A protein has these predicted regions:
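Zinc-dependent deaminase catalytic domain
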Residues: 1-136
């Protein structure tokens, strides 16, 4: 999972899913799913934190991400003042994330953050919010 924050065609910051700085990321920790999930810093938050650490303002920027933001990352994106999010359409995501993606979509809508969804198949941008329903 990766993320790039851009403004005026200039890269402001990048981030990726990973353990916090100085925390060992040996294979046994990645294989313990509960532990991994509990400490992983998502790409969006890493990009925002990296920008803050470097004194880079991200307000009004566009966030490009390789996976739809979860509700926690959506909150951070909104709080940082990001104006636009470009991400894959969540209808193609694993079912376990659907609830969080729906919450994120609602948060973005309420906060006025523009979201452009794309599909890997055609990489066409659209402003139509996805219709995501759990399957199975």
């Amino acid at each position: 999972m990766g993320c790039v924050l851009v403004n005026d065609r200039r890269i402001l910051s990048t981030g990726y899913n990973g353990f916090p700085k100085s925390i060992s990321d040996d294979l046994s920790r990645y294989n313990d799913r509960d532990f991994k999930i509990s400490i992983t810093v998502h790409a969006e938050k890493n990009a925002i934190l990296n920008a803050a650490k470097n004194g880079t303002k991200v307000e009004g920027s566009t966030l490009y991400v390789t996976f739809p933001p979860c509700s926690q990352c959506a909150s951070a994106v909104i709080q940082a003042g990001v104006a636009t999010v470009v991400c894959p359409n969540p209808i193609f995501a694993p079912e376990r994330w659907v609830e969080s993606f729906l919450a994120a979509s609602n948060l973005f809508c309420e906060a006025g953050v523009k979201v452009l969804y794309y599909s890997d198949a055609d990489l066409c941008l659209t402003e139509t919010a996805p219709s995501v329903e759990p399957t199975g």
